[in-house]
């Protein structure tokens, strides 16, 4: 890419106008311009509109995230950890499935460092429900790392770590439709964990997320319900990418295989942050039903990703792995470990 940043920006826009994919270096340079506050909202909106029309690639996403990491506040998690997250934007307004699943997975032995924000398209994002539970979320890197070390669970509140992303906020809002930025959050956990369980709402983004994680060398499960849910679904089979050792295996899972009943998405409908916090507590306290079932499935995905895969990921029997992980997740709730961990998290978040 041209050395002058003005030329670099114009070069990238010209490429996008011709429907050409950007190189990783081009993508990083463009994001550096945005995060550095060097571009007007009109210029950023023009870039996002052109990029959305063309469609994104895994190489572009990797370049964008490279720049985000260069600007991110530091956090160091030395031990193996997993993030469990959905891209959002599925329009179903469910309870906070991945947040509840994170607590269950951590209480079952996975080390979880979750990255999230306030709601963008729903009534209650991860940050909103955690605040409603009484958890202090505005923590720096050393405080989050301390929690992960002490209780096996921590939350990176995105604005605390990716503050430069504020430069793109008004432009994104002015466009009024999803852009490539919508999948950057789930892929840019500042702790850079080794493992991920990520749900993807948009079909066109599904393989891109998988390829970014493959190229990163992560262990991951990336999934999308056939109903469009950005979680492992109860109302339809779920497509899943199993990622490990730089390889990707595509599979399909159906909860009925483990005796979990089909349930409509309406059975998972959430509400305000306070209402979702009440649902979360009830699930951790052992309430049965569809909400528990979907949390068990998604917690199992996080447990599997955390435990990792053999070198021959193509030989992995993902069905067997889910059978074992579902038992661990269920036991974590039924033993009281999950609800106890939540109370520890609330308490320790105010003490670190």
For each of these PLM feature ranges, what is it?
Residues 3-7, 14-61, 66-77, 294, ...:
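N-terminal glycine-rich anion-binding loops that anchor highly charged ligand groups
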Residues 3-8, 15, 22, 70-73, ...:
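Glycine-rich anion-binding loops and their surrounding alpha/beta cores
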Residues 34, 52-54, 88-92, 119-121, ...:
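Short, small-residue-enriched loops and turns at beta-alpha junctions
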Residues 43-44, 113-115, 222-223:
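Short beta-strand segments at enzyme active-site cores
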Residues 55-116, 120:
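Active-site cofactor/substrate anionic-group-binding motifs, chiefly glycine-
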Residues 119-135:
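Active-site-proximal loop->helix
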């Amino acid at each position: 890419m041209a050395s002058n940043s003005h030329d670099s920006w114009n070069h990238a826009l010209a490429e996008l106008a011709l429907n050409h994919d950007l190189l990783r270096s081009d993508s990083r340079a463009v994001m550096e311009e945005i995060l550095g506050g060097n571009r007007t909202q009109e210029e950023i909106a023009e870039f996002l509109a052109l990029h959305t029309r063309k469609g994104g690639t895994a190489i572009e996403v990797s370049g964008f995230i490279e720049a985000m990491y260069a600007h991110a506040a530091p956090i160091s998690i030395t031990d193996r950890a997993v993030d469990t997250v959905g891209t959002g934007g599925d329009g179903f307004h469910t309870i906070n499935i991945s947040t509840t699943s994170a607590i269950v997975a951590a209480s079952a032995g996975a080390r979880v460092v979750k990255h999230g924000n306030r709601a963008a398209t729903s009534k209650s994002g991860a940050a909103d429900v955690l605040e409603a539970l009484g958890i202090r979320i505005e923590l720096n890197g050393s405080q989050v790392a301390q929690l992960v070390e002490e209780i096996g669970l921590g939350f990176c509140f995105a604005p605390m770590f990716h503050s430069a992303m504020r430069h793109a906020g008004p432009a994104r809002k002015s466009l009024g439709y999803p852009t490539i930025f919508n999948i950057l959050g789930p892929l840019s956990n500042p702790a850079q964990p080794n493992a991920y369980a990520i749900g993807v709402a948009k079909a066109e983004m599904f393989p891109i997320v998988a390829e970014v994680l493959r190229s990163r060398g992560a262990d991951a499960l990336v999934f999308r319900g056939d109903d469009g849910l950005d979680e492992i679904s109860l109302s339809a089979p779920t497509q899943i990418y199993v990622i490990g050792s730089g390889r990707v295996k595509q599979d399909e899972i159906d909860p009925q295989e483990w005796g979990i009943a089909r349930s409509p998405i309406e059975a998972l409908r959430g509400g305000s942050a306070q209402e979702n916090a009440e649902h979360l507590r009830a699930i951790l306290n052992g309430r049965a039903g569809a909400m528990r079932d979907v949390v068990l499935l998604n917690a199992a995905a996080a447990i599997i990703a955390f435990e990792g895969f053999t070198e021959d990921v193509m030989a992995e029997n993902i069905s067997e792995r889910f059978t074992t992980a579902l038992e661990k997740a269920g036991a974590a709730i039924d033993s009281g470990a999950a609800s106890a961990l939540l109370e520890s998290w609330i308490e320790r978040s105010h003490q670190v």
